[in-house]
Amino acid sequence: MAEKGDCIASVYGYDLGGRFVDFQPLGFGVNGLVLSAVDSRACRKVAVKKIALSDARSMKHALREIKIIRRLDHDNIVKVYEVLGPKGTDLQGELFKFSVAYIVQEYMETDLARLLEQGTLAEEHAKLFMYQLLRGLKYIHSANVLHRDLKPANIFISTEDLVLKIGDFGLARIVDQHYSHKGYLSEGLVTKWYRSPRLLLSPNNYTKAIDMWAAGCILAEMLTGRMLFAGAHELEQMQLILETIPVIREEDKDELLRVMPSFVSSTWEVKRPLRKLLPEVNSEAIDFLEKILTFNPMDRLTAEMGLQHPYMSPYSCPEDEPTSQHPFRIEDEIDDIVLMAANQSQLSNWDTCSSRYPVSLSSDLEWRPDRCQDASEVQRDPRAGSAPLAEDVQVDPRKDSHSSSERFLEQSHSSMERAFEADYGRSCDYKVGSPSYLDKLLWRDNKPHHYSEPKLILDLSHWKQAAGAPPTATGLADTGAREDEPASLFLEIAQWVKSTQGGPEHASPPADDPERRLSASPPGRPAPVDGGASPQFDLDVFISRALKLCTKPEDLPDNKLGDLNGACIPEHPGDLVQTEAFSKERW
């Protein structure tokens, strides 16, 4: 067994010396791979998280995570025993000179995601877990820390004593509440199913309330066994929220009308309130959820207020709900700002940055046993969740059928990088960038252009402003004569492409055909066409009539596509279509 564990450690590049044995895969944390192991010196099972320090971004995340977890000490936060360097050496002094770091943390039996995969929890269990979650959040927020990635996969459970512990602080962020951070926060990286509406609308402007929204979604999931808002992408996520969560404040209504007008009701009434969406949940729990899941974060309960709600009364004990005695302050964020600036530079400039700021966090990185015993707040962190995330990439949590560890065991990787790439395959492959996806949508006629629409329609829509005067009377009459004919936009295009692929001799009439020879017509008037030949595609007429359809605000029935059929001109003797003149007038 030990030999097999050592083999697993070598496969994933773990080099901790001989102190840790019997390595087994657990899953992925936000910043690295996680294996379980046995600490032969302390005689206990632990979880070891490996963080590769390969570039500015990974260095920034590692420094931030280590700094935060060293100061958090709470019953509902996973304990971190120590942070080690290569070959199991003590991680002291400058982190810049190391290529890898190992976080040795408390081993937890399972996580909430795996429990939910087995079925719905009993309400008493859900209530107990929610109390412990809020108890941990109260402490975390009092330390001026935002978790930013609360989800079932990052909440760990001991089934023996039903203790819940919050884990994986790889995306946590220090935010001193005494200072404004508007415009200085990186994109909130909560998994989109647990992302608040404010975070969807303004991904760079958020507060501790984003963690409370995620906690409310988790409670609803524990009570029902299903995700509360499971949108396929950010737009659908917001749509699902608006169908259930009322919008009360005028500033929120104004912003929604500006960003996504077609998804809001004129009366601002929700289609499926929480009581209707969750019929199996009792009224007291619904009242609790309604106070947590508010559209505006200013109306949302804080963790401390949530602990005082009647729904939490069976477990509430303010005397046993501690807060941090040494919260982070604005000066603790300075190093993050420096590292963010370094992240903008290329990896080739990283050596210069590291020499410029050689001791930025050296005191925080010294992990001495005597300091751990004396400090009132010791590093505490989880063994990690289910999916690796870069700061600009949002990966969705667990799939429905398997737990993260089961999926991890099904895959074999030869390196840390391959493991990361494979784990991204478990997501919905939806990349979230900044600014929000909602701001990038093109809105026309109160309807968003979905990414599956034909690209030609998207291109033509950009010409809406260029469309000037209406078509000529001749063109309209010619179009009206064909309104009842069945038409297909793409068949028209295909027919034209086919007619031009044969070469110039197929696209134009033979030179020796007297009936097709160009006549001496006045300028702007095309020559007569032959009625015995097959129709020809006129691109100018087609585009003009397509623009006519694009400028109409109402939805068009299928027979309206007959307007585009006029672009395919039957060759009847004497049937003159003023193509050139029409085109000039149109453009």
Swiss-Prot record:
What is this enzyme's catalytic activity, as reactions? L-seryl-[protein] + ATP = O-phospho-L-seryl-[protein] + ADP + H(+); L-threonyl-[protein] + ATP = O-phospho-L-threonyl-[protein] + ADP + H(+)
Recorded hits in Gene3D superfamilies, A to Z, give: Phosphorylase Kinase, domain 1, Transferase(Phosphotransferase) domain 1
Task: Give the matching InterPro entries.
Answer: Kinase-like_dom_sf, MAP_kinase, MAPK_ERK3/4, Prot_kinase_dom, Protein_kinase_ATP_BS, Ser/Thr_kinase_AS
Gene Ontology CC entries for this record = cytoplasm; cytosol; nucleoplasm; nucleus
Q: Does the keyword Phosphoprotein apply?
A: yes
For this entry, list what GO says about its biological process.
intracellular signal transduction; protein phosphorylation
- Keyword Endoplasmic reticulum found: no
Q: Which cofactor does it need?
A: Mg(2+)
Q: Which domain of life is it from?
A: Eukaryota
Arranged from A to Z, the UniProt key words for this protein are: ATP-binding, Cell cycle, Cytoplasm, Kinase, Nucleotide-binding, Nucleus, Phosphoprotein, Serine/threonine-protein kinase, Transferase
Q: Where is this motif: SEG motif?
A: 186-188
Localization (cell): Cytoplasm; Nucleus
* Chain segments carrying region Disordered: 373-413, 499-534
PANTHER family in the record: MITOGEN-ACTIVATED PROTEIN KINASE (PTHR24055)
Protein name (Swiss-Prot/TrEMBL) = Mitogen-activated protein kinase 4
**Gene of this entry:** MAPK4
